[in-house]
Swiss-Prot record:
This is Defensin-like protein 123. Keywords: Antimicrobial, Disulfide bond, Fungicide, Plant defense. Belongs to the DEFL family. GO terms for biological process: defense response to fungus; killing of cells of another organism. Disulfide bonds join 19-62, 29-49, 34-56, 38-58. The keyword Disulfide bond applies. It comes from Arabidopsis thaliana (Mouse-ear cress). The lineage of its organism: Eukaryota, Viridiplantae, Streptophyta, Embryophyta, Tracheophyta.
């Protein structure tokens, strides 16, 4: 899985500022590699596949 990252956006959620970043992949997203990629890049990173089949969506605290 070779990601190309796209600049993240910021949004507010229950008083905590969260950011997110999409990784555009060359192969279909797989759950565990997506989770691992996000948590290795961002200490508070949580990764899920989607919204497109070749994307990994990371959510993390902007204050990291």
């Amino acid at each position: 899985m070779r990601p190309r990252s796209r600049a993240g956006d910021k949004f507010m959620s229950q008083g905590q500022e969260l950011c997110h970043e999409y990784f555009q992949l060359t192969a279909p997203c797989e759950k565990q590699p997506c989770i691992d990629m996000c948590s290795s890049k961002y200490k508070t990173g949580k990764g899920v596949c989607g919204p497109a089949v070749h994307q990994c969506f990371c959510t993390f605290s902007c204050t990291v």
